[in-house]
Amino acid sequence: MGAKSDITENECQRLDRMFQEKGYADYKWIDPQKIIVSQWVRMKCIFGCGEYGKNACCPPNVPSVSECERFFHEYQDAVIFRFEKAVDKPEDRHRWSKKVNIKLAKLERDVFLAGYERAFLLFMDSCGICADCSATREGCKEPTSARPSPESMAVDVYSTARQFGFPIEVRTEYSQEMNRYAFLMIR
């Protein structure tokens, strides 16, 4: 739990049970104040990511880097979830991450309904819920489920994951195992 945690031990145990019942075993409670937000991550989105301007939950359709940083500082408790997989082709990754992201959206909803009105999820990959993204927030077909990825919120996932003791490396081939991370902001 976060350094100034608002969540009691009983609440934490109740949420742990919920996560585990839904099949999530590889996660840690974290202090969201320690999530590393960096301008270089946004630059990688703008100059290097094929989703830029084509996804309603990716830049330029997300808050500025300073607004992202302020967002994380409003929370005391969060959870980082780790997902690992090796795939042969980029399409395989997107198919897998879409399934995972849909399940994660349901988890966020369940946490919200459990009384955590501030629950907010960052998907483990770009949204990808719809086959045909509108590319704008206004035109989003799934506004209650669509969420940004940590990278689109300028999170340095590499440094943040390592800081919390998780493995992550740059892959040089799609067939190498990847570690993807989702963040559930709770309170």
Predicted regions: what they are:
Residues A25-I30, K34-N55, P59-R187:
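Catalytic cores of enzyme domains
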Residues G2-I30:
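TRNA-binding/sensing appendages of the translation machinery
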